[in-house]
């Protein structure tokens, strides 16, 4: 969103846009959210407090996108508390990469120590 420097600020702008849309449209039966990083999750997941905490720990892996997505999910949860919300992860598209494609060419010791893998986006 133009003029927004911080993901949280973008979330506030998008919340205003959402409020305006909800004032003119029927409430949805459910809401889907695109979230960049789902960690090891390979399938969509219902959004709740535990999932939000888990996804927040991954913010360093997608600092421009993850906090904004979580802020929007929070706003939607407040504006549409009865609508089920589901997170769909970019990482899920590549969760089943074969080991040869998912593994970086790094020393085995590093790979054993840190859970590094390719997720299929941004290199």
What spans do the regions from the language model cover?
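Short glycine-rich, Thr/Ser-proximal phosphate-binding strand/loop in the N-terminal lobe
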Residues: 1-16
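Short beta-strand-loop/turn "lid" adjacent to the catalytic site in phosphate-handling enzymes
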Residues: 25-66, 84-86, 92-104
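A gly/proline- and charged-residue-enriched helix-loop-helix capping module
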Residues: 54-72, 79, 113-123
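Short amphipathic alpha-helices and their capping/turn segments at secondary-structure boundaries
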Residues: 18-28, 73-79
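Short, contiguous clusters of charged residues that form electrostatic/catalytic patches at enzyme active sites
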Residues: 16-19, 70-74, 87, 123
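Short N-terminal secondary-structure initiator segments
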Residues: 3, 38-50, 110-123
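Generic structural signal for well-ordered secondary structure
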Residues: 11-14, 45, 69
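ATP-dependent carbohydrate kinase catalytic cores
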Residues: 78-123
């Amino acid at each position: 969103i133009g003029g927004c420097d911080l993901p949280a600020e973008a979330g506030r702008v998008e919340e205003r846009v959402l409020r305006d849309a909800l004032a003119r449209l029927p409430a949805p039966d459910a809401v889907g959210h695109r979230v960049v990083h789902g960690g090891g999750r390979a399938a969509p997941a219902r959004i709740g407090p535990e999932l939000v905490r888990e996804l927040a720990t991954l913010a360093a892996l997608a600092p421009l996108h993850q906090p904004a997505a979580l802020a929007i999910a929070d706003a939607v949860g407040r504006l549409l508390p009865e609508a089920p919300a589901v997170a769909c992860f970019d990482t899920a598209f590549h969760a089943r990469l074969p080991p040869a494609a998912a593994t970086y060419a790094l020393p085995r010791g590093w790979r054993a120590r840190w859970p590094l893998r390719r997720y299929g986006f941004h290199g």
